[in-house]
């Protein structure tokens, strides 16, 4: 009698296990995507800070404008730039926004900061 009442229960357990495995896989994919986006944001911040520091070292140009240009070319937005003429370092903060995560709806954004020091002899 107990065999009849439990008939088909393995199918339900397997379906639930497949759903859990699918959600876990989607979560792992989302974490991977966030890590890649963070890496892109950090690279963009590094490039923008180096461009601003180069302008500070050479004294030819606008460091903030070059930092903005490099940030934009790397698909980020310049949030902050501490790179005044005459300074010995450039500190740049950029923001990268992205969508397309599987478990998190809407847009997310990541900030990255980089510092480049002007080292003149």
Where are these regions (language model features)?
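A general secondary-structure boundary signal
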Residues: 41, 89, 109-110
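Short, structured secondary-structure boundary patches
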Residues: 27-28, 90-106
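Low-complexity, S/T/G/P-rich flexible repeat/linker segments used as non-globular hinges
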Residues: 101-121
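Alpha-helical assembly-interface signal, strongest on the long, hydrophobic N-terminal helix that forms
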Residues: 1-64
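Residue-level preference for non-acidic, small/hydrophobic
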Residues: 45-46, 71, 114
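Short amphipathic secondary-structure patches
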Residues: 49-98
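Arginine residue identity/basic-tract feature
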Residues: 7, 33, 38, 69, ...
